[in-house]
Design a protein with these regions (language model features):
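Core catalytic alpha/beta fold that binds nucleotide/phospho-ligands
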Residues: 1-147
Length: 147
């Protein structure tokens, strides 16, 4: 989950072996070349970097998988990541993280952040907080009807 005052998209993937030739179906020519030109021990990491950045972007613009991943390119220029898309020329700021061993996470926002803090929440805490929130709202609503 990602929270922002602007549009935001996020993707998290477990790094698992994949036939890198699948990239021909989903990546632009320049992205596929980026993976193929990577050192052999980094190709899988490059694949998942691109995959999570692309997914974060389409989530940010609200297209989900209704947009073909080949229709735009994620580009790297020194320390900057940007998107080339004639169809959706929006301001995007990308952040990528190796959050836990064998996991990649990418974030795409419409607002520049100097830091994007990551807060890990255990599932049971999230569920309990949600239940507490619902109970509080129900209590507030029931007290309004008593007036």
């Amino acid at each position: 989950c990602a929270v922002s005052t602007g549009a935001v998209g996020i993707d998290i993937e477990a790094i698992k072996y994949i036939d890198l030739n699948v990239g021909k179906r989903f990546f632009s020519e320049s992205e596929y070349a980026y993976i193929n030109n990577a050192p052999p021990n980094l190709k899988l990491n490059y694949f998942y970097d691109l995959w999570t950045l692309k997914e974060a972007y389409i989530n940010k613009i609200g297209k989900g998988l209704n947009m073909r991943l080949k229709d735009f390119s994620i580009c790297f220029d020194k320390n900057k990541i940007y998107v080339e898309s004639a169809k959706y020329p929006e301001n995007c700021y990308f952040y990528k993280y190796d959050i836990i061993k064998n996991f990649k996470m990418s974030l795409c926002t419409s607002i520049y952040q100097t830091k994007c803090p990551i807060i890990f929440i255990r599932q049971e805490h999230l569920i309990n907080d949600f239940i507490d929130l619902i109970n509080t709202k129900e209590h507030n609503l029931s007290s309004l009807t008593e007036l």
